[in-house]
Amino acid sequence: MKGKRFTSPEKRFHFIYPEDWETLVVEDIPAFFHPEMGGVLQIYSFAHKVGNVDSMTELKNYISVHEIEFNEELVATFTNSEGTNILSCEFKKEDRHWCVYAISNQNKLLIATFNSDIDIDDKTYKILASIISSVQFLK
């Protein structure tokens, strides 16, 4: 995918997103979107001071905030070329479609959320997979 590189302000991670997408930072949370699509990708960054991240627990915690019943059997798991663990799940709530990703490597964690008021099509899923797979932790 041709794209632009986003590097977090604290230099913890970077990834590639489509060059025709725009970016906006709201309350220190970067958001990425195509101006003609009905959704937005937001990236939340965390680091544990002690011990490694338990991605499944972090994903479950995020889902529970939205009062969604968590079902671990519906979580997809994969690893990118950097050895970064990625968990993915999706849900619908109040006419919004959500894709949530927990991306971790040792003590570092990103929660990436894409939410849209329209159903997510195959093209968008592929774009999201490319973005998420391109994540590299820097520190």
Each model region followed by its residue ranges:
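Short flexible/disordered coil segments
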Residues: 33-41, 87-92, 133-139
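Surface-exposed amphipathic alpha-helical segments
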Residues: 21, 112-139
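Signature of long, low-cysteine stretches enriched in small and polar/charged residues
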Residues: 60-108, 115-118, 129
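Short C-terminal domain-edge/linker segments immediately following a structured domain
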Residues: 36-38, 46-47, 53-55, 63-65, ...
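Secretory pathway targeting signatures of secreted, lumenal, and periplasmic proteins
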Residues: 2-61, 94
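Generic beta-strand structural signal
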Residues: 23-25, 104-105, 137
